[in-house]
Amino acid sequence: MLTTLKNAFKIKEIRQKILFTLGMLVVIRIGSLLPVPGVDTKFFSQWFAQQTGGAFSFFDAITGGSFLNMSILALNINPYITSSIIMQLLTIAIPKLEEMQRDGEDGRKKMVAITRYVTIALALIQSTAMAIGFGRQGYLIEFNALNVITAITALTAGSAFLMWVGERITEKGIGNGISIVLVINIISRLPQDLSNLFEQFVFGKAPATAILAVVIIFAIIIAMVVLVIILNDGVRKIPVQYAKKMQGRKMVGGQTSNIPLKVNTSGVIPIIFAQSIMQFPIIICSFIGYNGTGVWAEILKGLNSGYWCKPSQPIYSLGLLLYIVLIVFFAYFYTSITFNPLMIADNMKKQGGFIPGIRPGKPTSDYLNKILNYIVFIGAIGLIIVSVIPYFFNGVFGASVSFGGTSLIIIVSVVLETMKQVESQMLVRNYKGFLED
């Protein structure tokens, strides 16, 4: 690993890309310290500390602490991620967008521009809701039009700036810029989470107990990382044979190919969707100062991951069951709109391709559907295990950490993808890469 990094820095182009990326990440961390003008950050921090559960903890984790500090980067790149998902879904529903996506480089540029506009619109909506909510709850120094407009402008500009930084990293740096921005924010909270764990389970304990706690903590982390790597890189390859045919005086075709089906075909999307649906009511109620009464108060607690897996309050773990069901549902739903077995089977038939032992056309489509349903189920189970383990330890053992399965999946997938990109650039220049170390 160290030799590979050393070789990478020997190559001027790669060195410049790495240094540019690191420079942009430093700028982001500095920006996370700049408070939103007009917001009483001290009072807001006190309110945040009183919030129970994972809704705000997760949101703060992916913003790298910017939400807790109520900095100008508090919205993070969440509007951009939401915008990208919306555009991906609309591309399937709206033929014009689908045609634009297939229209080469020009179409891609138009899609990127539309995604930017949708991002700004979503950032405006979110920042407006936050600014007005802050004013009503007394988190603004003074609730007036100037402070509200200032907060809206600062939060929207911060989100737009992060989008711009992400695009610049993609263009001039290493890896996918948006993903790297998200990862650096998550990683910035790891020292605090590890400190909390050690303070709670290691420091002040008997030596034997402390050593056992350290071993268990790192064993769980390593096991989760290994599982995420398997989910990220696991692939089921469906063999495809192409029939031979005469073209002029030559016999062409007869090649063997495959259709790679990833174990985790939907990535982290099912978890993000499930969390968004369950945490949205909690966040809205918190901002407007409504804690609920009667049945509604119990429902809010059930939706709050901070109450899950608590032995003294098992009824609220029904919310965890709903969370699991939503993950499975969105795993199948998202895969169904991004992978079309019928279209693949039709294209294979037109090109003279077939799966050995399976007739072309509908039988091929049915076979792909059957395999895909099995793979999606396995992937969903993996996602559930990775995402539920942190909730289990938080509830049963009171481990107060914001770092969860979603964060781990994002970090591992982005790190692996970035390593592969550096690897490919190293191999072009005849250097060994990470995968050969």
Locations of the language-model features?
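N-terminal cationic and glycine-rich segments that engage phosphates or anionic surfaces
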Residues: M1-Q101, E105-D437
